[in-house]
Amino acid sequence: MQLQLICEDPSQQSHLDELAARWQLSHTDESDFALVLTAERLELRKVDEPKLGAIFVDLIGGAVGHRRKFGGGKGQAIAKAAGLNKGATPTVLDGTAGLGRDAFVLASLGCKVQMVERHPVVAALLDDGLARAKQDPEIGTWVSERMSLIHASSHDALDQLAQDREFVKPDVVYLDPMYPHPENKKKSALVKKEMRVFQSLVGADLDADGLLEPALALATKRVVVKRPDYANWLNEQKPSMAIETKKNRFDVYVKASMA
């Protein structure tokens, strides 16, 4: 993957070089996207649209921190979908981790969550945000214990894990594929910004239907698929049940009870 790689703090240039090597990123002046290492964090910027601002992973403050404190605990839809309301604390593989928000919610409720992000730039942002969260005095201990990023940013990462006999299969596989966003649907300013940048960088997950089969092969208890309320079932496969919110629904494919 080629994009602009910019280091604002010269003392951290070697860190940016390591990061680029890990995620197989290389510099080009031609790209409209810049991955910028500031003194505080790693950011993604759309060079030709500076008003959009920077995208970065913040698991400590902002909307994520607010949701951790006031988000409704195990009563919220994602927790019910993952089976936490049954008294279980399942292990989870988030197969489309993105900026890590849903994985963080599940981890904050006690789940051990392994994350896979197929796009290397997004994975690099997530890795950086996770490293900062692990240093935080309030949440660092349990983030370190419960959240990990699997360094697999290929499109067949789930297939590879399903076939790996050494890999301990999770109770739950969680999927939230990028879905084409209709213009007439209202979104918050932050989500709009992120969607615009991501969809121009990553594109919609046009192969998302292909994620369901390996997810079902990996999960021992259930697969949870987050969908916009207007979207079809993933791979046109009817779920065992659906948990609906105002704008989304969680389609749940049950393989075994959570007990």
Swiss-Prot record:
Q: Does the keyword Transferase apply?
A: yes
* Main location per the UniProt record: cytoplasm
Q: What class of enzyme is it?
A: transferase
The residues that the entry says bind S-adenosyl-L-methionine are R101, D102, E117, R118, S153, S154, D176
Enumerate the subcellular locations listed in this protein's record, separating them with semicolons.
Cytoplasm
**Which UniProt keywords are present, listed alphabetically?**
Cytoplasm, Methyltransferase, rRNA processing, S-adenosyl-L-methionine, Transferase
As for family, the record states: Belongs to the methyltransferase superfamily. RsmJ family.
HAMAP family, per this entry?
16SrRNA_methyltr_J
- Name by which UniProt lists this protein: Ribosomal RNA small subunit methyltransferase J
Q: Which gene encodes it?
A: rsmJ
